[in-house]
From Swiss-Prot:
HAMAP family, per database record: Meth_synth (MF_00172)
Metabolic or biological pathway: Amino-acid biosynthesis; L-methionine biosynthesis via de novo pathway; L-methionine from L-homocysteine (MetE route): step 1/1
Gene that this polypeptide is encoded by: metE
Protein name listed in UniProt: 5-methyltetrahydropteroyltriglutamate--homocysteine methyltransferase
Origin species: Bacillus cereus (strain AH187)
Keyword Methyltransferase among UniProt keywords: yes
Positions that bind Zn(2+): H645, C647, E669, C730
UniProt-annotated catalytic positions: H698
Sample GO molecular function, one term: 5-methyltetrahydropteroyltriglutamate-homocysteine S-methyltransferase activity
Length: 762
């Protein structure tokens, strides 16, 4: 029996976020292109070497990127929109596509399947010349070979997933464009094979959710590629779910190895294998370590999985690997010594997961006796965390048991509530607001750092936050916004902030993961039962309201987003954790309301991303996700207006869920997706308050009043003006003050123009 260890992808950002810092230094012209490329190469090779030193045999090459691996593939295949044609250098084109420029709108960005990573959406245009513009995987393969002597495993995004993630073509064009991808993929694979690549990983995560017709279509493409590259050793890699529905066909694809996810698709993949077996002439790559969470593996469970597989499959060749790329986990837990022993011992970040793969490999090749001590350690760790007092709170259990049906609904229906709210709030037609955060300047970040390091006192820090809050309340009044926000200057991250103030959470010092581009997040760790402790947002919100006669809205992050943007305990269902968070937020919302706050926004930007990949599993998730939001928000008076916000999602799938949230107003990202949600509303009605974002806050460019007015105009064709709000796409935390103020002034002017037009037409 031949067994190898492999990794699907390694975190890009560096142990001290060197990758992020290098990118941002280059963007701000602090380093030149030569220094940028040199530093990036050093980081890239350091990551390859780290995996080699951990004992990984099949080391991924080409998973490293300057921004996003889907963007890399788009550039490589010539999917470069014509609006970027005036840029000549590779990096100028590449970063303009990713980030936009003063005069160019960036390509759309959206969630990578149901993760919190974002990819740049490839754009197809008529007349596009599809060809292999740059064999980047080959360059990086040869680099690792020459510099480190590592014969790596090139990783590429497969043609079917790539085109399915792209936009700009009609369904009728799909098959034609797909066939046009054969030639560049043949060239790419031929050159890699000729250079000596022993195995090439071709990622096709979309295979988890294809129809039978689509799988047949994909198979034909792989047959066409195989015909031209008969000797390349291809590993067809799936992840994020099982391929159960199409497994029988997928195992006949002309590839030498198939990778399956036995963490997030364990039940389905095992069921398919028990029914259809696995070909003797292929290698089974077993995703047996969770690539999306941070907990130590249950080694006994993994070894039992292999025992089951060895009984049911014909092959004698296995690859031991994570369930997906380790992009979604922090790099190393060694710096987290501040954590309690029971929690620290239970964690496994990327480097620890690689060590687990090597342990499993040892057990499979040399017998479990070879890792007897490690197995005993793992069993003790799991027992300790399971029996922890933090995971067994009686008060949390009692609150959950006491829930009644009426805890999940508002007293009056929306139309009646909204009438009462209009009387109470006295807002104009087409009210303007922002999504919540304002620029976190260098001064804001530096002052917070000084406070955390004990350089300044609590009192000095609070005075600084109050000064920033007052400054931005005045800015908002001068701009002419209708509903104001306090600016969130006290918050580093919209999830971390709440986690720090709730029981059941813990925080890493260096547990960073990439969200999009150079933006990294440090997800909280939900390790115990979640419970309310004290007010979390009351002081800052009430202070902001005391400064103005205008309405100030409270700002909270919703239960499902806190759940989906955290590393979550894996010993109870996610639904139960979500309900615990919702009950804690319910306390906070009641406190805000009793403190005189009449508009409360509960953001759920991550509602869509938590959906399972398979449509058959959607209803169960949506039901408890919606119930969690309702549990958090339903105890307020009818006169209190509940807002929510969502961004970066395929909203067409969840229009019914959005409606079921029963929020009085929802604001949605629409400008970057170039009006797709507006198109959705042409085919369905939405009869509650809604704000469709009028400008993309992820780009530094300041859009004109006319651009925003155009989106308002389009929106009012599908939305009732009585319920329509005007706002940016998302929070403004990452933008500069000199970008934010003119953009908001243009937005308010666009709103005034739209009001005038409505009055004229009336």
């Amino acid at each position: 029996m031949a067994i190898q260890t492999s990794n699907l992808g390694y975190p890009r950002i560096g142990l001290q976020r060197e990758w992020k810092k290098t990118l941002e230094a280059f963007w701000s012209n602090k380093i030149d292109e030569e220094q940028f490329l040199t530093t990036m190469k050093e980081i890239r090779l350091k990551h390859v070497k780290a995996q080699q030193e951990k004992g990984i045999e099949l080391i991924p090459i080409g998973d490293f990127t300057y921004y996003d691996h889907v963007l890399d593939t788009a550039y490589m295949l010539g999917f470069i929109p014509s609006r970027f044609s005036e840029f000549t250098s590779y990096l100028d084109v590449y970063f303009a596509m990713a980030r936009g420029s003063k005069d160019h709108v960036a390509s759309e960005m959206t969630k990578w399947f149901n993760t919190n990573y974002h990819y740049i959406v490839p754009e197809y245009e008529e007349g596009l010349q599809i060809s292999l513009k740059d064999n980047r995987p080959l360059r990086l393969y040869e680099e690792a070979k020459q510099e480190l002597g590592v014969d790596g495993k090139p990783v590429i995004l497969g043609p079917y997933t790539f085109l399915k993630l792209a936009k700009g073509y009609t369904q009728e064009q799909f098959a034609t464009i797909l066939k046009q991808l054969v030639a560049p993929y043949v060239q790419l694979l031929s050159e890699l094979h000729a250079a000596g690549a022993q195995i090439i990983q071709v990622d096709e995560p979309i295979f988890a959710s294809l129809t039978k017709e689509e799988v047949q279509q994909a198979k034909e493409i792989y047959e066409a590629i195989r015909k031209e590259v008969p000797n390349a050793n291809l590993l067809l890699q799936t992840y994020f779910d099982s391929v159960e529905e199409n497994y029988e066909e997928i195992i006949t694809f002309p590839v030498s190895s198939i990778g399956l996810d036995f963490i997030h698709g364990k039940e389905g993949n095992l069921h398919a294998i028990s029914k259809y077996g696995f070909p003797a002439d292929k290698t089974l790559a077993v995703g047996c370590i969770d690539g999306r969470n941070i907990w130590r593996a249950d080694l006994d469970e993994v070894l039992t999985l292999f025992t089951t597989l060895q009984k049911q499959v014909q092959t004698k060749n296995f690859i031991v690997q994570p369930s997906c790329s380790l992009l979604h986990t922090p790099i190393d837990k060694t710096e987290e010594t501040h954590l309690s022993t029971e929690l620290f011992d239970a964690l496994a970040f990327a480097n620890q997961k690689l060590e687990e793969l090597v342990l499993i490999h040892s057990a499979l090749t040399q017998g479990t006796e070879s890792i007897r001590n490690e197995l005993e350690t793992y069993r003790n760790v799991h027992h300790t965390i399971r029996s922890s007092a933090a995971r067994n709170r009686e008060d949390v259990k009692a609150a959950r048991t006491a829930l009644k049906e009426e805890d999940f609904s508002r007293p009056l229906p929306f139309e009646k509530r909204y009438e009462l709210q209009q009387v109470a709030l006295k807002l104009p037609l087409l009210p303007t607001t922002t999504i919540g955060s304002f620029p976190q300047t260098t001064e804001v970040r530096q002052t917070r750092k000084e406070w955390r390091n004990g350089v300044i006192s609590n009192e000095q820090y609070e005075q600084f936050i109050e000064k920033e809050t007052e400054k931005w309340i005045r800015y908002q009044e001068e701009i002419g916004l209708d509903v104001l926000v306090h600016g969130e200057f006290e918050r580093t991250d919209m999830v971390e902030y709440f986690g720090e103030r709730l029981a059941g959470f813990s925080f890493t010092k260096n547990g960073w993961v990439q969200s999009y581009g150079s933006r990294c997040v440090k997800p909280p760790v939900i390790y115990g039962d979640v419970a309310f402790i004290n007010g979390m947002t009351i002081k800052e919100t009430v202070y902001a309201q005391s400064l103005t006669e205008k309405v100030v809205k409270g700002m909270l992050t919703g239960p499902v987003t806190i759940l989906n943007w955290s590393f979550v305990r894996n010993d109870i269902p996610r639904k139960e954790v979500s309900y615990q968070i919702a009950l804690a937020l319910r306390h906070e919302i009641e406190l805000l309301e009793s403190s005189g706050i009449r508009v409360i926004q509960v953001d759920e930007p991550a509602l869509r991303e938590g959906m399972p990949l398979k449509e058959k599993d959607w209803d169960a998730y949506i039901t408890w996700a919606v119930q969690s939001f309702l549990l958090a928000t339903s105890s307020v008076a009818n006169e209190t207006q509940i807002h929510t916000h969502m961004c970066y999602s395929n909203f067409e799938d969840i229009v019914d869920a959005i409606r079921a949230l029963d929020a009085d107003v929802i604001s949605i990202e629409t400008s970057r997706s170039h009006g797709e949600f507006i198109d959705t509303l042409k085919h369905t009605t939405y009869e509650k308050g809604i704000g469709l974002g009028v400008y993309d806050i992820h780009s530094p460019r300041v859009p004109s009043k006319d651009e925003m007015y155009k989106i308002v105009e389009q929106s009012l064709k599908v939305c009732d003006p009585k319920y329509f709000w005007i706002n940016p796409d998302c929070g403004l935390k990452t933008r500069r003050t000199e970008e934010v103020i003119p953009a908001l002034e243009h937005m308010v002017q666009a709103a005034k123009d739209a009001r005038s037009l409505l009055k004229t037409n009336a």
